[in-house]
Amino acid sequence: MSKMKITNARRTNRVRTALRRTANGRPRLSVFRSSKHIYAQVIDDAKGETLASASSLEKTMRDAGNTGANIDAAKAVGKLVAERAVEKGVKEVVFDRGGYLYHGRVKALADAARESGLSF
């Protein structure tokens, strides 16, 4: 493995370990960012199941024209995952940025999720 991959893996593990310590039974809002799309899911680690998910690949996103890996798509994904989580009765989550900097698309997704009813 390259030094950069090892560094990124260590950062991801460090962030997730810190989250598990402070979660107190709350589900986590996990973000994955690729060069073409953005994905988010609300995961209950105690049960090991996904409660809600959304991505820029979904048909509703394509119809609205919010596809791809830009800030507008991240905002739409954040809003959609928050609405789905609130429908399932989840209002409190822990934000798992997954080793990504809290900036740009990750920040836009988090802000949109907060505006749509999730608190973290």
From Swiss-Prot:
Q: Which GO terms describe its biological process?
A: translation
Please give the start and end residues of each transmembrane region: none
List, alphabetically, the Pfam families matched: Ribosomal_L18p
Do you know which InterPro entries this protein is assigned to?
Ribosomal_uL18_bac-type (IPR004389), Ribosomal_uL18_bac/euk (IPR005484)
Supply one GO molecular-function term. Answer: structural constituent of ribosome
Q: Which domain of life is it from?
A: Bacteria
Sorted alphabetically, the keyword list is: Ribonucleoprotein, Ribosomal protein, RNA-binding, rRNA-binding
GO cellular component term of the entry, any: cytosolic large ribosomal subunit
- Give the CDD domains listed for this entry: Ribosomal_L18_L5e (cd00432)
Cite the PANTHER family for this sequence.
39S RIBOSOMAL PROTEIN L18, MITOCHONDRIAL (PTHR12899), LARGE RIBOSOMAL SUBUNIT PROTEIN UL18M (PTHR12899:SF3)
Q: How does it assemble?
A: Part of the 50S ribosomal subunit; part of the 5S rRNA/L5/L18/L25 subcomplex. Contacts the 5S and 23S rRNAs.
Q: What does this protein do?
A: This is one of the proteins that bind and probably mediate the attachment of the 5S RNA into the large ribosomal subunit, where it forms part of the central protuberance.
Give the record's family classification: Belongs to the universal ribosomal protein uL18 family.
User: What name appears for this protein in its UniProt entry?
Assistant: Large ribosomal subunit protein uL18
